[in-house]
Amino acid sequence: MKRTLYLLALSLSLLAELSAQTPSLHGVVTDPSGALVPAATVQLRGPGGEQHKTTDGSGQYSFPSLRPGKYTVRIAGKGFAIFEKTELDVTAPTVLDVQLQIQTEAQVLNVEADANTTVSSDPDSNGGALVLGQKELATLSDDPDELSQQLQAMAGPGAGPNGAQIYIDGFNGSSLPSKSSIREIRINSNPFSPVYDRPGFGRIEILTKPGMDSLHGQAFVQYNNEDFNSRSPLLEQSTRPPYKQEFFGLNVTGPVKKNKASFSFDAQRRNTTENAFIYATDLSASLVPQTVNQAVLTPLTFTMLSPRLDYALNANNTLTVRYQNTRSSSDNQGVGSFNLSTLGYNATTSENTIQATETSIINTHLVNETRFQFMRSTTGMTGGTNDADISVQGAFTSGGAQVGNSGTRTNEWEGTNTSTFTHGTHTFKWGGRVRGTSLSSTSVANFGGTFTFTGGDGPELDANNDPIAGTSIELDALEVYRRTLLLQQEGLSDAQIRALGGGAYMFSIAAGMPTTSASMTDVGLFVNDDWRVRPNLTLSLGARYEAQTSVGDYGDITPRLGIAWGIDGKGSKAAKTVLRAGAGAFYDRITQATFLQALRYNGVTQQSYVIFNPSFFPNVPTATSLAAGLQPQQLQIMDNSLRSPRNYQANVGVDRQINSFARISVNYIASRGVHLLRSRNINDPVDGVYPFGDSEIRLLNETTGLSRTNQLMVSPNINYKKLFLFGFYSLSYGKDDNEGQPADPYNLRAEWGPSTFADVRHRFVLGTSIPLPLKASISPFIVLQSGTPYNITTGLDPNDDGIFTARPELVTGVTAANCSGANLVYEAKFGCFNVNPPAGAATIERNYGRGPGSATLMLRLSRTWAFGEKRESDPNAGGFGGPPPGGGGGGRGGPGGPGGGGPPPGGAPPGMGFNSGRRYTVTLGVNAMNALNHPNYAAPNGDLTSPFFGISQSLAGGFGPVGGASTYNRKIDFQLRFGF
């Protein structure tokens, strides 16, 4: 027995020794300051052919199981010179750590072209990801608001109803930086990495530039006014409403101590005279319906200041500290669509953010990164009156803004620690994140009260406004309101007015303590192993744990799995076709705003009274009298059995390198959401009986919602000489049942219908840049998409709970001529609707309508002039990249992104695609939003009792203020940029 054990131990020892002596190559890539450089391309050429790798989030690379012999290693990263080492003898496990240097733009472009058009079995090199370098960024807007919307469009529907999650240098929640300070953007990269809580198909990672060791910078001014814009086709006035934007920006970077520390500084200022668009119907002084088609000035200002320090503590430790302050003010908020100008108020916002990241290269196998962020934001609302509001469903809302002196102060902090360890064919990554949020909110919303008028029925009136005996017709809300005012002038009582079809349907008012506070903490832990099973096969195995306070669901452990197989890769031969598959579960957080509402409207902190068929219009009762009369309230309640919303997602796809300059990726993505948050009234009367024995409206927030999405995405990428192209096409089908309040709170299955965000069937995004004569370039950015589903409702409240989501019955076989009566409404596009269907009748599905498609072209034309003395490239002009901004690249399960370098020397304005090596550059640019002036309409009004049913009341929007509530359809900006 002892001999057997001895032989077994000896065998294992020999096997371990043989394994340990198997030739391999690994190392860490850094910039001149010692900061890590993820996403660098590593090319290995030697016995058996050529292999390619990409450094992971911690700047590490690994080539396991090599043949013994001499190799040539070439390493290149965006913004760096190409490193090359020949005759490297690899006969055992070998370590090669490399420090890259800054070099010329020409080399950078070659590296970008190679990285964007080759395929790899690395987890972070999925072909379905969009990687936007300086060339691609040049096609996008300089305005941070417009840029954010463009990035959201590129993220696609995989992001979910809350939109894509944006990480800036690994931090989530801070404001978007200026485009001039952005080094790279990665969208939908490494989608199943357990480093992240949210699905990767819908993740945007923004990596900012570090400082440099010589002074560089740029400044720009952008201008626009109404003379260069085109009116919204919905605006009826013949003249353009006033508009002006003045946009200034500054970016400076330079040394603090050579090869030790550097700084960068960003500043922005925007002064914009924008307009809100009111499209409603109210009554004239003589009680005649009139259309309100009006532009209302909404001036706004925005200021941003952001310094950054990159410091090399020693050869193995780097520190980056960044501070950002933003301030904005805007007037006449709350105005637009049905909301008349009397509802306007002024708003201010300020945000202070400090971020610190420390990276330690413990040894060639182990890297640790620690990040911390603290953010304080303050919002304030002032102005307007506290007059009671009048809400006429589907027509208009007027009255006072009722904001008083409201506002919210929020403190948010986040701490993250991540370690990466490479061993043989394995790259292990583990770490965790803790976040905390506390807020104090002051609100006097609806302290002045609101009268609501809805549609109904009543006798037909003759020309003298006298009732015609024996008649009954359907009345819209505006007519009910008109009759109320008319009959009050004639001295009729409330009962008489209601008999003739008038009278307010509902009165609501809030009272109590204006200020409410709430806090929340959540934690996430993860572990991952990227196992290089073979040179052309990588298996990623990981898990993540999530938990948050106020939700008693503490067992949220989710597996993450990914596989990448280079089908035609053999031995050291690089694959040109990579098959990818992955699966995982992703937990979402229930927002603090949801808990805040429940704390505010719990019947104690604030009281929200609701009175149906009030007889006192237009007089407003006091809250004291309502409390004394034990009037019913609307309560917000959190379910005791809340669970964390989760999304199960799976993906299979193929990345194919077509030739040296073209690549295409095809992916199928399936998602299933469970335990999604929804709200419903659990005290709706059943056969006239209230389940809780009183008439209080109890809105229960529960996690019982479901969703399902299937998506096919095709992503091409072309990089040929000076021409490049990126984008995607997606075909998407999606359904859910948790959008808004249900029509029947006891029949949630009836809510299963098309999703407003996931059932946009066709999406097409394309960005490119085309060189023109005279050193000019033109950069189109195109977004096409089919129509968005929208809900069709009756505009009525058959459940008497103040919720207007009831859907009609579509009566088949009834012609327009026969579709008449008290409850019937005919719409040519759909047919005959019964807005008050009998019990048990089949109503239409939620989101039964389909809005119009949209087509938007953004066009940028630019020309750069260079002057001053010729500047030679300095191989030592490295940037102090600091630690790799987490949230970039994701590589091999990691959050790190390209951290070092910055733009090449020469002062070329980033994104302009031109670098002469001269000291100074001047660039003149013209940017056109919706260049073709194509009208893109929003989804139509879906209220059957509204005079606007089937009519779009606003533009669909596009990027920034063009579209949506804006009064302009096309906007043309002029920009002058100076670089040095």
Regions found by a protein language model. Give the residues of each.
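Hydrophobic, lipid-facing positions within transmembrane beta-strands of outer-membrane proteins
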Residues: 200-202, 246-250, 303-307, 350-356, ...
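Periplasmic N-terminal accessory/gating domains of Gram-negative outer-membrane beta-barrel systems
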Residues: 81-101, 105-210, 216, 225-236, ...
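Transmembrane beta-barrel strands of outer-membrane/channel proteins
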Residues: 113, 219-225, 265-269, 321-325, ...
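Short, solvent-exposed micro-motifs at the edges of structured domains
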Residues: 536, 550, 572, 633, ...
